[in-house]
UniProtKB/Swiss-Prot annotation:
InterPro entries: ECF_substrate-spec-like (IPR009825), UPF0397 (IPR022914). Keywords: Cell membrane, Membrane, Transmembrane, Transmembrane helix. Belongs to the UPF0397 family. The chain crosses the membrane at residues 11-31, 45-65, 72-92, 109-129, 147-167. This is UPF0397 protein str0306. NCBIfam families: PRK13661.1 (NF010182). Its main location: membrane. It is a multi-pass membrane protein. It is found in: Cell membrane. It comes from the Bacteria. One of its GO terms (cellular component) is plasma membrane. Pfam families: ECF-ribofla_trS (PF07155). It comes from Streptococcus thermophilus (strain CNRZ 1066).
Length: 181
């Protein structure tokens, strides 16, 4: 258990650092303060490999620090949404366990269903309500911004996350694949 907690803490720290760096230097603005954020594909990979706790804190800590450094203020609803996205993807990780060297079409479907659920909770509920409380913006703007971000993140994770997981799975040795000559 102790090794597992150390592994989780280290993975969270590395993941949060990657979240910050990728988020600050690799983003494509699309709407308002919303942009395509490629760090969510990496967060999906970490969430599956290291579990939901790492996924949550990688997104939560990484997003909070990124916003603080980049903008000088933090939108806590969006920070929480990043954490929830990683948490939900990680919670369903057993459905698409890539550590055994397999990432089948069915695993890809489960992965994308899980990320869709996480994004629906994060951007359909958390960000609009949280921003209404924190910034008192108009509901129409909040839902439009959340919808665009949710769709952009879905596409990013569906393409980038699926590719990263497929590459990772192909680098693992499958059970029973080694034979003695």
């Amino acid at each position: 258990m102790k090794n597992n907690s150390i592994r989780t803490v280290v993975a969270t720290g590395i993941g949060a650092a990657l979240f910050i760096i990728i988020g600050m230097f690799v983003n494509i603005p699309i709407f308002g303060n919303t942009s395509i954020q490629l760090q969510y594909a990496v967060q999906a990979l970490f969430s599956v490999i290291f579990g939901p706790i790492t996924g949550f804190f990688m997104g939560f800590i990484g997003h909070a620090l990124k916003d603080g450094i980049q903008y000088g203020n933090i939108s806590w609803a969006w920070v929480l949404a990043s954490g929830i996205t990683g948490l939900v993807i990680g919670l369903f990780g057993k459905k698409y366990d890539v550590t055994m060297g397999k990432f089948s079409v069915m695993s890809m479907i489960w992965f994308n269903l899980a990320q869709a659920l996480g994004l629906l909770i994060a951007y359909g509920v958390v960000t609009p309500i949280g921003d209404k409380i924190q910034f008192a913006q108009a509901w129409s703007y909040l839902y439009a911004q959340s919808f665009v971000a949710g769709v952009a993140n879905f596409i990013t994770i569906a393409i980038g996350g699926t590719l990263l997981l497929a590459i990772y799975a192909s680098s693992r040795t499958q059970s029973g694949s080694l034979t003695k000559d």
